[in-house]
Structure formats: C-alpha cells, structure tokens
Amino acid sequence: MTQLDRRSFLASSAGAAAGVAAGAGLGLSPAAAQAGGVLRIAMTASDIPLTTGQTDQGGEGQRFMGYTVYDSLINWDLSRSDRSSSLTPGLATKWEVDPANTNRWIFTIREGVQFHDGSTFTAEAAVWNFDKLLKEDSPQFDRRQSAQGRSRIPSIAGYRALSPGVLEITTRAPDATLPYQVAWIMFSSPAQWEAMGRNWDAVALRPSGTGPWRLDRFVPRERAELVPFPGYWDKARVPKTSRMVLLPIPEANARVAALRGGQVDWIEAPASDAIASLRQAGFQITANAYPHNWTWHFARNPGSPWNDVRVRRAANLAVDRQGMKQLLADMMIPAEGFLTPGHAWFGNPTFKLRTDVDAAKRLMAEAGFTPQRPLRTKVLIAPSGSGQMQPLPMNELIQQNLADVGFAIEFEVVEWNTLINIWRAGAAHPSSRGASAMNYSYFIQDPFTAFIRHLATELQPPAGTNWGLYSDPDMDRLFQDLRTAFDPAALDRAMQRIHEKYVDEALFLMVTHDVGARAMHRRVQGFVQAQNWFQDFSPITIAG
Amino acid sequence: MLAYIGRRVVYTVPIMLGVSLVCFALVHISPGDPLVSVLPADASEQLRLTMMRLYGFDRSYPEQFGLWLWRAVQGDLGTSIATGRAVATEVLRAAGNTLRLAALATVIGFVFGCLFGFVAGYFRDSWVDKLASLLSVIGVSVPHYWLGMVLVIVFSSQLGWLPATGAGPGGSSSWVWDWEHVSHMVLPAITMSVIPMGIIARTVRALVAEILAQEFVIGLKARGLNEVGVFAHVVKNAAPTALAVMGLQLGYLLGGSILIETVFSWPGTGFLLNAAIFQRDLPLLQGTILVLAMFFVLLNLAVDVVQTMLDPRIERG
C-alpha cells in the first residue's frame, strides 16, 4: 500500500477541493472542470441509450451514443446543414461491388484506427462484430444489440476477413443499398469485451469504440459523460469541448425548466408552446429539415377505400398544411412529397401537393362521395409516440379538412406501442380493427427505410412492415432497379423515380415533416444542424 | 406480544403471494409488446418472434410465473429487458433515492400536518381552525404535478434559487448531505408532502375534537391539570391513529410518485416505473411493483406492531 505523507495529502485535497468547487456549479465530476468547456444536453429519452455498440432508443440513441462513441464502416457526412446528408468513408476507406459477382462487396479497412482501449480495428474485428449481431452461437452474441442491429442489415448473407485490411460481405441478392444498411452498424472492441470478462453488462459500464468521444462516466438512468478521444483517426472531428454530459429528461417542461434554470446548455425537442418565450429569453432555437415524415399510411388490401387514386389525391389536396404549421408554431415543414422538399431523391413529381378544396371535392364527387354522402372510414391513431409530433390536434385538423370534401373519418385511438404492434401485424390482421389507414411518422433516411420497407410486396407482414399490404409489380420493378443501381448517380435516379411514383399516385397522405427543434444557451457555438437524424457534436465550442 | 407479532408475520405470507400473482397478471394482461424496448420499431414480425424465443416469452404464462416466483424468493428479480441490468440492483438503487425524498416529505408532511391538525382541533371553529382546515383541504385537493410545475417555474426558472431537475451534481451515485445536493430535494419533497400533510391534518383535527369531547378530558381538567398537561394526554391518545395514517402515507410515498419524480427527473421508483411502463420492460415492472408492494406490506406490519406497543388494547382486540 502506498504511504501518503501529510504534505502530499494536503496538496491533493486542495486540488480536489478546487476541482469540486469549479465543477460543482455544473454538476460535474472534478475531472470535468478544465478548459474547453462542458456541453450539457438534456435528451428526451428516459434512460441513457445502450452503450455497448448497437444502441437502442431509436434515432436519439444512435445520435448520442452511436455516432459519438462508435463509428461505422460507412458514416454519414454531418458537416452541412444546407443539403441532405450523404454517406462518407468511416472505418472503411473504400467499398465496391465485384463486377463479376454483384452479390459480393469488398470493403477496404482504414489503416491505423484504434479503439479507445488501444487495440486496432481490423477486418477480423468487423467480422467479430457481425457475429455479435447475427451468429446466435458465437460467444459474443448479444441479444440486445442483435435486436437493434439485425433488422438493419437484411441483405447480408455472409462476411469474412480476406486480410486484416480487407473485408468481404456477400448479399442474398444483388443490393446496391447495402452501404446504407451497413451505415447502421457500430463496431465495438473485441479486446475490451475480453478484458471485461466477456460480459456485455460489464462492457456497458466501460465501453470501447473508435468514435471521437469516449465514455468516461456512466450512471444508469441519470447521466453519461463523454470526453474527447485524442487518438481519433479523423483529426478534424476531435471534439473541441472538454466534456459532453448527457442527461435523460423525458418530460418536455422539465427540459425547458432545466435550460432556463441553467442546469443544461441544450435541450432536445422543447415543448412547442415554450419556443417563443425561450427565444424571447435569449436562447437559440435551431431547426432544420431532416428525414422524417408524418403520414397516414393507407391500407391497400381488397375493400380499402384508398384503392381509388381519386380518393387518395382528394385527401392530399384537402389538407390545410399552412393551418397546421400555424398550429405547430411554425415547427414543421409542409409536405410537398414523401421526402423533404429539395431532397436529392425528390425528383419531379407531376402531382403537386397543395391545398385545393374544390379540386378535392371534384375528385371525391367523381369517386361517388360528397360532404352530404361522405366516405365513412376508420383511421388508427395514437395519442402520443416517438416522432408523432402532436398527433391529437393534428389528426383532428385533418379530420375537419377531410370532412369538408366528403370524408367522415372515425378515429380508433390506441396506445403507441399497441399501434407499433398493429403496424407490424398488417392491415388485414384483426388487431387493425377494420381501419383503412394509420397515422404513422417515419424515419426516411436511406433507400430501405424511406421506401422499400413500406411498399415492397415481399415485405408484407410478417416478413416486413408493408402494413398496408400494398402490391404493385411496377413498384417492385422500381425497387429491383434500385437494388441493381450500383453507380451512385444511377441509384439517385432510381430513388427519384420511386419518389415520383409515391407522390404521383398519392400512395400516402403526406402531411408534414418535423424540423428537429432544439433550444440552447447562447454560449453554445459552432453547431451545424445536419439534415439527418444524427448530428456531429465535435465542432461545438462553449463560449466563455 | 410475541405471539401477536408472529401471527401478523404469518398473515403476510399469503398476502405477499397474492400480491406477486396480481402484479404478474396485471403486467401480462395489459396490452403491448414486452420487446418494444429492445426492438427497433420497424423490426419485422419474424424478428420479433425470434426475439420472443431468445427472451423466453414464448413459454406459457404459468411457466413464466413459476420461474419468476422461484427466482424471486431467492432474491433474483431477473434482468431488465431494456438495460440488461439486474432488476434488484435497479430497484434498490431507485428505492434508496425515493426513500431519501420520502423521508424528507414525510417529515414535512407529518410536522405540518400534525401542527395544523392539533391547532385546528384544539381551537375548533375559530379563525385558526378555518385557516388550518383551508390549508389542509388545499393540500389534499391540489394536483401535485401541477404544484410541482408551478414551484419549478417560480423557484427555478424565474428566481433561479433551486434546481429544477436531477438528484444533485454528479447524479445520485455521488450523493452527499450538503446543500448542493439537498437543494435538489427541496422542491420535489415539498410537492410530495402536500397530500400527506392535508390528510394528517384532517385526521388529527377530527381526532383531537373527538378526544376533547370525551369524559376523561373533563376529568383531567376537574383534577386541576393545566392546559399543557391535558394537551399531552390528547396527543398520546391521538398518536396511534396519527401514526397509522402516517405509516400508510409513508408507504404511498415510498412507492414514489410517477408524476412528481418525472416532473423533477428524480431517479426514484416512480421515475423507474414510468420508464418501465413506457418501455414495456416486464421484468423491471414486475420487480418494482413487487418490491414496492412488499415495502407496503412490511410497513403495515411495522405500524401494527408499533400501534400495539402504544395501545395494548389493540392486541387484545
């Protein structure tokens, strides 16, 4: 045991006291009280997202604990706010499909990348991580991470390391969207898992990734403190603040109070009725388009009233999107299509989304309905839910809009998690209770989540989440074209053609896009809100 | 006395068994998917079924209940689906935080409740009685989540005197009894104390009035006992009932308040229950409800015993 003399004890005590005094005001451990500034963020989650690699808690989990502590083989470029995000090299410097066998992809692994524990990232480590998610009999298989990651990479049939620097991935069928799928997968350190006794629960407390941030302190359900990883391979993305503190505060008013009271510097999703007063009090409000939409997903099984394109178009023309914008204190972007306006995959649809009550009435009359003899149908909604914005007043507004042109909408209100289960089960399942549509908001970031999963015939439940049981050989052909569009420009064009069909045939009731509102203190500087579910916290600085 | 205590302990066994059955059944018959916290929303039904198998939810309910109960009696409440952490550890940590908050709320509620109750009962129909009664009615009636929000707006947002959320700098794991930490408890504890304060005040007021009307009080006065002496007798007679009411209130407070702990982001059992409910984390939900129910049962047992010690007539009854 080390002997501690009186002088050194006093010196260390004084240092500790100074550290505590400096950090106390911020609610930080003494080590945090240093130059560079501390960024304290209130998340909407009720717990710290899973820290072991493949995060839970949806987009927010990946935003705060995925792309901070970890990297993917292919990352999202989050450096721009003025255009939709694109993919960029991450742990792989290059990826290409084998021209002789389009089921085979070769990934070139970035050299010299180190995990936070000092071990090196190699193709073998990548294989180990895929086994962690997909191979149930592997020692490192983790059902929690598997639950999160497995559905993200449906095309992967096999993988192997050809050398430490080369990874081969094979797909079940040619699939040009593979890079977007791979961008979901976070890579944790095999060496750390070994060091923690091959125990993921132990790894959760001391995880090790390759990302720009390292988890320094973790109090379950209360806080996570991240510090910069100086050895990060992308020197431009080494964080500028000395620490980032993540606090789960699920209640919107509590987050606002924490910001106003100086307990945090940044809150996610402030209550919309608090935005004006926060702005007035000098806080910054940031918002930007991001790949989210708020829709009614139409059932397309036999007997559904939405099988008539005139009815679908009429509903889309009846919605007063500007009125809804007023309702939401401007915190929305009126839908012009399924994707956000100006998106690289938007294309040039001929059916323009606008409010035109007369045109909607004409279409409904052609279909045999009037306000006096309305089309009666039932729609499933939830009173709240992730990404659902303010579903009750929004749906009531739409109900009124549609009543004006010949619809009589009855709502079937169910709890959010119940709605998710109904969504998985399909429109023909008894749990759908005869509803012909469902209010659902979507994460629409990549080809699969944006389009394929909703309308591919092969993904009708239980195989996938084509809730409406939509089936159109033309659409399936477009999806097939997309999967074989290995040239990026060809892929973009294929996506545009799919989006044009989505809009021209009014395949959904396309209402609005959320804007990812955040409120932050004036001293938070340098944040670039990318048009993405994930964000880069590295360039942020805290002004004195 | 020992026989009475032994009898009371034996009575708790079927109660505990019933509680465990009810809490298992309630959790399982409510709608929703136990894997909602671990599956992405867009996971397919096929993947959901695979995960149901991996987590053991494909077994029959009696089998699941039997396994859970067998482990629970050995102190293993299972593992949280959402976090993978041991439920017992999660619940005990949260219960410690709630206990801290509940203790302060109890002290505030008991002291002010008794004060208002005794004053109102002793000076019945005076303006003091009316004021104390008004305060106690407000305490019982006011929605505490609303009160919590108002307190936050006034004392945190506007005045900046007290923190609005959390369990102190560094979280509850580094708790120390200094002002920096205690300041985080003030607003939630006051919010939490208003209901027990109102209930105790009303109970004590009625008790005091009833006791004062009894013949022994007239006897005491006739024997020349001064007001302080009479008051002491009144307090002694009112104590068992007041204590029983307080015990029950402490039981409620130990359960944490989902609303208060959510408003203040206090990491106690209420906050934990809220997370477990929204995440459909069945093992955590079952474990938390079971532990809270056990707290309640044991607290009632303790109150019964203390009441008997204070008033031997209860044992004879």
Regions found by a protein language model. Give the residues of each.
Chain A
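Ligand-site clamp/hinge motif
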Residues: 201, 231-277, 408
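N-terminal lobe/hinge region of extracytoplasmic solute-binding protein
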Residues: 43-100, 206-210
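Ligand/substrate-recognition segments at binding pockets and active sites
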Residues: 220, 365-442, 467, 488, ...
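Append "and occasionally in soluble cytosolic enzymes with long acidic Gly/Pro-rich linkers
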Residues: 225-230, 279, 306-405, 469-473, ...
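Extracytoplasmic/peripheral linker and loop segments enriched in polar/acidic and small residues
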Residues: 313, 325, 405-421, 449-521, ...
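Surface-exposed binding/hinge segments that line
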Residues: 108, 120, 127, 143-193, ...
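Gly/Pro-rich hinge or "lid" segments in bacterial periplasmic/extracellular proteins
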Residues: 74-82, 175-239, 243, 251-253, ...
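Long beta-strand-rich cores associated with HINT superfamily self-processing modules
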Residues: 518-544
